[in-house]
């Protein structure tokens, strides 16, 4: 097994750990989930480039008669990338004392101001930064509003 294979195993393990955390661990942290809203995905061009480069590496490894384990590891990495970028749905998870946004816990007390932009983006102003929350379904913003009013 080469260093390349070890690095590929490390990247696959990191992506797998992220996927498990995102799907199974995060919804169970900090109490029961009150509301989970699917969000719009960010630009997919990055994911196309990533998976495309992995496919090029697989092709290059096969045509140069590279190690079979490397081909399988590259294929597993491409599948993990495909899952993370295209199948997994990003979401905001509301709990009793805060919410998870982009896998980061934010308490309700950190919210200084909230606005709704004209194009349906919920803007939350925190102490140091601004969160731009783009929901998939515009009707979900009413659910978020009702939840925030009831918890505050």
From Swiss-Prot:
Q: List the disulfide bonds.
A: none
- Pfam families in the record: DUF986 (PF06173)
Where does the source fall among the domains of life? Bacteria
User: Which UniProt keywords are given for this protein, alphabetically ordered?
Assistant: Cell inner membrane, Cell membrane, Membrane, Transmembrane, Transmembrane helix
Bilayer-crossing residues are 6-26, 45-65, 67-87
Q: Which GO terms describe its cellular component?
A: plasma membrane
Its annotated compartments are: Cell inner membrane
Note the topology in the membrane. Answer: Multi-pass membrane protein
Q: Which InterPro entries match?
A: DUF986
Which family is this protein grouped under?
Belongs to the UPF0266 family.
What protein does this entry describe? UPF0266 membrane protein YobD
- Please give the organism: Escherichia coli O1:K1 / APEC
Report the gene name: yobD
